């Protein structure tokens, strides 16, 4: 940065502002542009892909102010915060320098503008604090007004927090240094999320519009989080504070999905995109609220049987009543994002189009009432809920309908927002404006007749405004009531009281119209704001309607059936499918499979070749549970789901490498988390656990994990373990509740007599017998020479060992020590190695044996 004495006043002003807002990218208003300087400019030019220029040696880049929203949204999506610095003074006075200040801070967690948000995604600002034994959190979606808090006093390992963050996928997180360190070390926050260090707001002063003291008893950390978050929002968007009222939510009311499960099951995104996810597959919702609610339900399946059945019944009723669905869809199509519009109404940020959208949305009240008259029994509890609000909705709809033009301009200042007939004064002003020439012509005729001056005419100039002009020759006839304004060579100009009044009306009509429209618009907005509570719960009910009918539609489209749900330990389904994988394959080519866990079998060990369908089989079990417990039908011929409390998965290690830990370390961390926190009600998916280390290590660990999870007298978590360690199939012989399955393949000879395999994707009882690795390698296009060589090696190995490499042995330990290293020793051509090479080989073997 330059020495301050060399700086221009402007740059000094900039530096001053920037130094107080180091964590913001400052959008510094200069005329029609927002300029960024220095490090901000470098960062912004990279994020926005715009050119970097210079100003007095300082890097700089800029964007036109009218297109700023687009650029701001890009910066926010990178997890950065933007400070909007506007010219606030008049720019007069000695310095001629506009006074400037930050008028608004836009952060990823506090945006409300539609064009900076994704319509069907909640945008959470989360505040988290840990304490000695547990943690508390507040989650706020400022754009919709959703605000809840929770606390777990007894969760030293922060497992619950990790699950919660995985489900919320926050846009921004507030925390203190201690919490940040703990959360970071356990990799709970992806790097792209904005984190802000804030001091704890440890007041016991609860805002008067919040739930009473008793709710917060023993919820100190949760309250601190709520107060801290509100304080932060209040600084950035002061209007919000009173609109946000928290409720306490017990996290343990929902099925816990760990971070690995949310990601690898591809519930709401696949490699970062919505497409390819379960949510995308299921989403036929019509309203933005419906889309968000669906996502929310997928990530937060229920645990309470009665609650699940309540949802299931609604879905079932829609399923049985296709007409109800069709007719509802038409009504919902007119409803825009009421939740987000109401947030902007509440903060005074709503524009004309917001209110026009609201008008259209609320205009459905009549159709909705009719629909409930006809189909109310489909959603009994929503009927009461919505009908109890319908008079308020109707009143507001009438107000909006009479007040707001259906297709108004974007900005209030463009005018033409308030409808004709809404306000007499406004109509009058508009008439005045429109009739100005007529009124003047009338005045002119009247004055001519009164004075008998035939040359009298009415004119206008910018200096004197409206005037009456009389030619010099006739000026003698001018009455006393005229006031002379100007004398020309052959004419005199006058004004009269009446002309002045008309002039006033005309000249100021436009300005008055604008002012009046603005104030009328504001009063409508304020009136709406008084009903924000009703409107929000109306929006919520609409969202639920949307999701129920949507799930019924999915059941039809994807051929789902209604599962039996109870409190048992059973997880059983016939002809179960993975809906997302199925949708990607040609029609009818997905192979359904049965599953039966929790009865005789506690743990299934599934072996089989790569690409055999093991992982898909594991995942579809989890998807079954999630769908069932969110209230949906499921992709199976029949299904019985005993309520599951947690789904924990250890699938695919590759992606975590990016976060800076070794694959194996990540794998073991996640596995230890599973072992530490599973309960008899949990479903655990272990996919190739142990792959990240040497074979011996891997087998031993996988073996020990399975034994750990096994509960000989029942009451163990349900486990599906896919593995390519054939050795694990021995567990079946030792433990009654462990059962072997394999992904079936068919071996056949092709035209050239080469043996090939076909994947059948059928998961069958019993251990398979071979690892088909070489065949898979062949299918994957390994060079023929490699395949031939591999086949030769395996043949030699088998011949030398006198048995198949992967044959079962009674004692797994014996099997281990008869394997790879011994085989390698046997293979060494002692005539062809130098003593040095031999020594190196021995060292290498020793290392592997000792590792
Ligand atoms: N039940 C099935 N029916 C049809 N195709 C399947 C089935 N299961 C898996 N597949 C196909 O096989 C591929 C590999 O499946 P996957 O479960 O990943 O194999 P594995 O885990 O055994 O290596 C999938 O991407 C899918 O295209
Ligand atoms: Mg797999």
Curated annotation (Swiss-Prot):
- Give the UniProt keywords, A-Z: ATP-binding, DNA damage, DNA repair, DNA-binding, Nucleotide-binding
| Pfam families in UniProt | MutS_I (PF01624), MutS_II (PF05188), MutS_III (PF05192), MutS_IV (PF05190), MutS_V (PF00488)
Q: Which residues bind ATP?
A: 608-615
Tell me which GO cellular component terms the UniProt record holds: cytosol
UniProt superkingdom? Bacteria
Give an example GO biological process: mismatch repair
Which PROSITE patterns does the entry mention?
Answer: DNA_MISMATCH_REPAIR_2
| UniProt-listed NCBIfam families | mutS1, PRK05399.1
Q: What does this protein do?
A: This protein is involved in the repair of mismatches in DNA. It is possible that it carries out the mismatch recognition step. This protein has a weak ATPase activity.
Name the HAMAP family for this protein. MutS
**Name of this chain's protein:** DNA mismatch repair protein MutS
Gene behind this protein: mutS
């Amino acid at each position: 940065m330059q020495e301050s004495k060399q700086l221009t006043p402007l740059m000094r002003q900039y530096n001053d502002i920037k130094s107080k807002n180091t964590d913001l990218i400052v959008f510094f208003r200069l005329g029609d542009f927002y300029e960024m300087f220095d490090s901000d400019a470098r960062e912004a030019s990279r994020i926005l892909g715009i050119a970097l220029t210079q100003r007095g040696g300082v890097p700089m880049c800029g964007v036109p102010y009218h297109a700023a929203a687009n650029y701001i949204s890009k910066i926010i999506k990178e997890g950065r915060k933007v400070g909007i610095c506007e010219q606030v003074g008049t720019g007069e006075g000695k310095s001629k320098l506009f006074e400037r200040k930050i008028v608004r801070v836009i952060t990823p967690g506090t945006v409300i503008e539609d064009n900076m948000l994704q319509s069907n995604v909640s945008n959470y600002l989360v505040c988290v604090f840990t304490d000695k034994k547990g943690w508390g959190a507040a989650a706020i979606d400022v754009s919709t007004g959703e605000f809840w808090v929770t606390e777990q006093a007894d969760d030293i390992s922060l497992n619950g927090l990790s699950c919660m963050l995985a489900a919320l996928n926050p846009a921004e997180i507030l925390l203190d240094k201690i919490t940040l360190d703990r959360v970071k070390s356990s990799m709970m926050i992806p790097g792209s999320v904005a984190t802000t260090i804030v001091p704890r707001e440890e007041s016991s002063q609860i805002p008067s519009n919040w739930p009473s003291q008793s709710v917060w008893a023993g919820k100190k950390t949760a309250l601190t989080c709520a107060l801290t978050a509100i304080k932060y929002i209040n600084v950035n968007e002061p209007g919000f504070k009173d609109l946000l009222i928290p409720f306490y939510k017990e996290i343990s009311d929902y099925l816990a999905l760990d971070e690995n499960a949310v990601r690898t099951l591809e519930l709401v995104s696949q490699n970062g995109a919505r497409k390819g996810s379960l949510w995308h597959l299921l989403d036929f919702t019509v309203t933005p609220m419906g889309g968000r609610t669906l996502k929310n339900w997928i990530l937060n399946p229920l645990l309470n049987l009665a609650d699940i059945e309540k949802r299931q019944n609604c879905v079932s009723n829609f399923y049985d009543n296709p007409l109800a669905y069709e007719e509802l869809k038409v009504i919902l199509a007119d409803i825009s994002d009421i939740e987000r519009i109401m947030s902007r109404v509440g903060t005074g940020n709503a524009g004309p189009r917001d209110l026009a959208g609201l008008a259209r949305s609320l205009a459905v009240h009549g159709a909705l009432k009719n629909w409930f008259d006809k189909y109310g029994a489909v959603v009994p509890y929503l009927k009461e809920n919505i009908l109890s609000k319908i008079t308020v909705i109707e009143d507001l709809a009438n107000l909006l309908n009479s007040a707001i033009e259906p297709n108004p301009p974007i900005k209030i200042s463009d005018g033409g927002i308030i409808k004709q007939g809404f306000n007499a004064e406004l109509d009058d002003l508009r008439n005045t404006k429109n009739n100005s020439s007529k009124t003047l012509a009338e005045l002119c005729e009247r004055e001519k007749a009164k004075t008998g001056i035939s040359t009298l005419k009415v004119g206008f100039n910018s200096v004197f405004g409206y005037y009456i002009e009389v030619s010099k020759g006739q000026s003698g006839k001018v009455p006393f009531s005229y006031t002379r304004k100007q004398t020309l060579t052959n004419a005199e100009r006058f004004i009269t009281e009446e002309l002045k009044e008309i002039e006033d009306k005309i000249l100021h009509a436009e300005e008055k119209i604008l002012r009046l429209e603005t104030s009328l618009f504001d009063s409508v907005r304020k009136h709406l704001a008084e009903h924000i509570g009703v409107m929000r719960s109306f929006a919520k009910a609409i969202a639920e309607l949307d999701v129920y009918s949507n799930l019924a539609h999915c059941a039809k489209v994807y051929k789902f059936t209604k599962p039996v749900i109870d409190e048992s330990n059973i997880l059983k389904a016939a002809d179960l499918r993975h809906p997302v994988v199925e949708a990607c394959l040609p029609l009818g080519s997905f192979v359904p499979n049965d599953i039966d866990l929790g009865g005789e079998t506690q743990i299934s060990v599934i072996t089989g070749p790569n690409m055999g369908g093991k992982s898909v089989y594991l995942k579809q079990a989890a998807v079954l549970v999630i769908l069932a417990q969110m209230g949906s039908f499921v992709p199976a011929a029949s299904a019985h789901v005993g309520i599951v409390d947690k789904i924990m998965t250890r699938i695919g290690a590759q992606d975590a490498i990016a976060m800076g830990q070794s694959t194996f370390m990540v794998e073991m961390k996640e596995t230890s988390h599973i072992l530490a926190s599973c309960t008899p009600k949990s479903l655990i998916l272990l996919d190739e656990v142990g792959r990240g280390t040497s074979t011996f290590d891997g087998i031993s660990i996988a073996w020990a994990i399975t034994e750990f999870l096994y509960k000989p007298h029942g009451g163990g978590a349900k486990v599906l373990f896919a593995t390519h360690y054939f050795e694990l199939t021995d567990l079946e012989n030792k433990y009654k509740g462990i059962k072997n399955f394999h992904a079936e393949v068919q071996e056949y000879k092709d035209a050239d007599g080469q043996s090939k395999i076909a994947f059948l994707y059928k998961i069958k009882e019993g251990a398979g017998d071979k690892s088909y690795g070489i065949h898979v390698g062949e299918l994957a296009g390994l060079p023929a020479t490699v395949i031939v060589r591999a086949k030769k090696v395996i043949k030699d190995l088998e011949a030398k060992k006198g048995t198949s490499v992967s044959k079962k042995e009674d004692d797994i330990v014996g099997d281990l020590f008869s394997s790879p290293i011994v085989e390698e020793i046997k293979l060494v051509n002692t005539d062809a190695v130098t003593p040095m090479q031999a020594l190196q080989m021995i060292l290498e073997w020793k290392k592997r044996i000792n590792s």
